[in-house]
């Protein structure tokens, strides 16, 4: 595939855009560079390639610096629209990052939910990397609120959010996010995924996002297995959760690659007990193959550590969250489907930030996770060194933890497959208004 090296850039017509690019360069570049080096998986030339792609395709589209921004990002707890992550497996360690498509006007009165920004930036990215827009355009069309709907969401958000919070008072929110893009860095190659949030459309129309999601899943070409779709739909219908669908993610690939591309449906639950995890991973007992059960047994051994409970828990324990206004953010699951695959693959996610006591304690818990999984990152202070080189001292007094989310998957091909996601602290005392 030939990559169009013309940068996907926001307009450079004013000092605000230039200041934003400078700020995000100073924040994001050292972090990505540090993680690439610490992982031990990338040559110097490969590292340079990924830093250049960050500069060309991402930095220009993160929006103004926080003190001048129209909105903060909801991708991270710090408000950063850039979320780095590290994938740990029995093979090599890989660095990834996700970012929110905001551009110069995302979150402003002219683009309240950053819909126009996402459409423009995603179109340019697909053109630059030679990706098909067939699936992407389908999800954009289905989930994109009109400008009038986007403006109405601002007024409707407080009532909608109160459904999750039990009446607890929240800071005023003006929007929900719309599109994220993830870059997975493998050697010199970058593969991409796009994530589409149906919440804006759901709030504006009052129609459950799940109804629209099933309709779109069944309309895609190449077609996904109807067996897989029916299986997930029935499972979720038996476990009704308000506004359960969080995101739909797809692989961004060229036209030929669509025949093996993934679609991932993300849902949240209101319970984080291991019994809930078992229920979702096995689809209520429907999946009982050797790989599923082996992965479940491994996860059972580390689940209490992922919940930041090093002394252990029983299988029924539903841990309280740090932020009682975020009752919906207890645990997440994704159901991965591909054309021709009859059964979905289930991946588990935890919003670690809602369980963290301190980043230092979380590091200790994850080093124990890595030891139990047989990863070299469990050696004394190895993971801590990676963390501190990228984000500074683990023992800090920042208001938000750096550890953001975590995911777990076990597959026959890859073995244990775990990713840790981070909220980069903002620089220079910057804050969002």
Curated annotation (Swiss-Prot):
EC code(s) of this entry: 2.5.1.-
Entry keywords, A to Z: Transferase
Disruption phenotype: The disruption of the whole terpendoles biosynthesis cluster abolishes the terpendoles production.
EC category name: transferase
GO molecular function, one term: transferase activity, transferring alkyl or aryl (other than methyl) groups
Pathway given in the UniProt record: Secondary metabolite biosynthesis
Role according to the record: Indole diterpene prenyltransferase; part of the gene cluster that mediates the biosynthesis of terpendoles, indole-diterpene (IDT) mycotoxins including terpendole I, terpendole K, terpendole C, as well as the kinesin Eg5 inhibitor terpendole E. Terpendoles biosynthesis begins with the synthesis of geranylgeranyl diphosphate (GGPP) by a yet unidentified GGPP synthase.
Similarity section: Belongs to the tryptophan dimethylallyltransferase family.
The protein's name: Indole diterpene prenyltransferase terF
